[in-house]
Swiss-Prot record:
Source domain of life: Eukaryota
Catalytic activity, reaction form: L-seryl-[protein] + ATP = O-phospho-L-seryl-[protein] + ADP + H(+); L-threonyl-[protein] + ATP = O-phospho-L-threonyl-[protein] + ADP + H(+)
Gene Ontology BP terms: cell differentiation; intracellular signal transduction; protein phosphorylation
Residues that, per the record, bind ATP: 124-132, 147
Name under which the protein is recorded: Calcium-dependent protein kinase 3
Listed GO CC annotations: cytoplasm; nucleus
Record keyword Iron present: no
Short motif J domain EF-hand interaction motif, span: 402-411
Principal subcellular localisation of the protein: cytoplasm
Annotated organism of origin: Plasmodium falciparum (isolate 3D7)
Length: 562
């Protein structure tokens, strides 16, 4: 049986040595003058865990400094725990400047989609350039939605690729998630999360009109996602009920915006958009003149808001020509019995959305602060609180291996809303101003409000949660850090593994990990330092030292505790 020796050195630090018979050329531990130690050439940072072979019983910190020592030794691991150690580890991670974006995990493949998915015979919906089908992952049996677009019908393929690029950049609870794309000689396939609750349009047709409290629930989501888009200089240009889907059939289901086919990047406040795009009932007057800005979305949302409350549009006619003529005049009324019990605050917000002068028209961030939302607040999971387990998960996430953080981000991205229901609701409550992200101050405030004591190194933890270095906590970043790794299903772990395993051969190579890590995450060429970083990430979890990671090693990595 191999010996595990804990030995105090002259400087008062603690060395952990694995002792067994070996040749001089096969040293078990190589020492350096730093916080790093090595086991068989595997770099171990203070406070971290690594995968080891059968002869190596150690998983954890190799060096410890401080007067108080808490050393836990068992068959599988040796851990040295101390708040100062944890702080040192977080500081070393911050100095390493390891940052990445989730968009790099949305991969594009060439080949046959049906090698991986079974498509439904009947489409869920039809569009100008193709259809949307329900798709079932052949191996994992997970349901997705697949938009199948014919290249022959596409008038402008580069324009369509811009739609894909826009979707890759979006990370918001009210935006349908793009998961991966496929392309063959005839078609392009967009694999997205599946929404089963139907269109907002269908619900309006069925219901007729809605009470103000439910309308506020819908409009807050619409203004929130528009605020998110406009902050990123993206104009949707086709806001209408048909382009919002309910995630599921539950009464409190969120809505998701879809179809970015007409979306466009813009320069803030300039009237540089010229293309006449949109749908007659919802199109803004400036679009018809051929010179408009992002506030065309606010006009369209005002029309949608009007319809929610009464069941019919403010501008109507027997033909598109008549409808557009009414839009150009911009005249509408709040007459009819449907408006008798509608509040003045609701009417005021509609008026501010349907202001003819775009410069005076309300923007999404202003709309979210309108008094109507406070008066007609929809009580959607407003009692959602963060418990101590979420804070513990944040702390654990900060100490994860780089590879593990990548995997947790992919799992958060691949998870459906059912898997993260409570965390999603918590995120929405914390996002008080509806920007689609949480500031570090908002997260601190939310934790303290729920009676949780923040660790003294919380700012360092936040830097680790902010994986793309944007200075704020995006939706997927929050979910990735808050997820309980003990609750991860084998299916979700395999979902992440399969993203890394680009060629689908059952193993993750250095080249594949580099492709994932730097795909869309790095400007310029990959340097030797980047390559060395990836090699270290592989080495940290490569249990059998073959230079590759199989699913067993990957699964074991995801189970490591701290």
């Amino acid at each position: 049986m191999n010996d595990l020796i804990i030995k105090n050195n002259k400087k008062g630090s603690c060395d952990v040595i694995i002792k067994y018979k070996c040749k001089k050329s096969d040293e078990n531990i190589k020492r350096r003058k730093s916080s790093h130690k090595y086991i068989k050439n595997k770099s171990v940072v203070l406070g971290r865990s690594i995968m080891t072979n059968k002869k190596e019983k150690l998983k954890g910190a190799l060096k410890y400094k401080g007067s108080k020592k808490e050393i836990k030794i068992c068959n599988k691991k040796s851990m040295i725990k101390n708040d100062k150690d944890e702080n040192t580890t977080l500081k070393s991670m911050k100095s390493d400047n390891f940052k990445f974006s989730r968009r790099g995990f949305i991969l594009s493949f060439t080949g046959n989609l049906e090698d991986f998915y079974n498509l439904s015979k009947e489409p869920l919906g039809k569009g100008t350039y193709g259809c949307v089908y329900k798709a079932t992952d052949k191996l994992l049996k997970i349901s997705r939605a697949v938009k199948v677009v014919s290249k022959k019908k596409l008038k402008n393929i580069p324009r369509f690729r811009q739609e894909i690029d826009i979707m890759k950049n979006l990370d918001h609870p009210n935006v349908v998630k793009l998961l991966e794309t496929f392309e063959d000689s005839n078609q392009i396939y967009l694999v997205m999360e599946l929404c089963t609750g139907g269109e907002l349009f269908d619900k309006i047709v069925k219901k007729g009109c809605f009470v103000e409290t439910f309308a506020s629930f819908i409009m807050k989501q619409i203004f929130s996602v528009l605020n998110y888009l406009h902050i990123r200089n993206i104009c949707h240009r086709d806001i209408k009920p048909e382009n919002f889907l309910f995630y599921d059939m539950t009464p409190e289901s969120l809505i998701k915006i879809i179809d970015f086919g007409l979306a466009s990047y813009f320069t803030h406040n300039n009237y540089e958009m010229k293309t006449k795009a949109g749908t007659p009932y919802y199109v803004a007057p400036q679009v018809l003149t051929g010179s408009y800005n992002y506030k065309c979305d606010m006009w369209s949302s005002g029309v949608l808001f009007y319809i929610l409350l009464c069941g019919y549009p403010p501008f109507f006619g027997e033909s598109d020509h008549e409808i557009l003529s009414m839009v150009k005049k911009g005249k509408y009324q709040f007459k009819g019995k449907e408006w008798n019990n509608i509040s003045e605050e609701a009417k005021d917000l509609i008026k501010r959305c349907l202001t003819m002068d775009a410069d005076k028209r309300i923007c999404a961030s202003e709309a979210l602060q309108h008094p109507w939302f406070k008066k007609k607040k929809y009580a959607f999971n407003m009692d959602m609180k963060m418990d101590i387990h979420v804070l513990e998960n944040f702390k654990n996430y900060g100490l994860l291996l780089k590879f593990q953080k990548l995997a947790m981000t992919i799992i958060a991205q691949q998870s459906n809303d059912y898997d993260v229901e409570k965390l999603k609701s918590t995120f929405l409550v914390l996002d008080e101003d509806g920007k689609g992200y949480i500031t570090k101050e908002q997260l601190k405030k939310g934790l303290e409000k729920d009676g949780l004591k923040l660790p003294y190194n919380f700012d360092l933890l936040l830097d680790q949660i902010d994986s793309d270095g944007s200075g704020k906590i995006d939706y997927t970043e929050f979910i990735a850090a808050a997820l309980d790794r003990k609750q991860l299903s084998k299916k979700l772990i395999y979902c992440a593994f399969r993203v890394f395993d680009v060629d689908n051969d059952g193993e993750i190579t250095t080249a594949e990990l580099a492709h994932i890590l730097y795909n869309g995450n790095k400007k310029g060429n990959i340097t030797q330092r980047d390559v060395n970083r990836v090699k270290r990430m592989i080495r940290d979890v490569d249990k059998n030292n073959d230079g590759k990671i199989d699913f067993h090693e990957f699964s074991e990595m995801m189970k490591l505790k701290f």
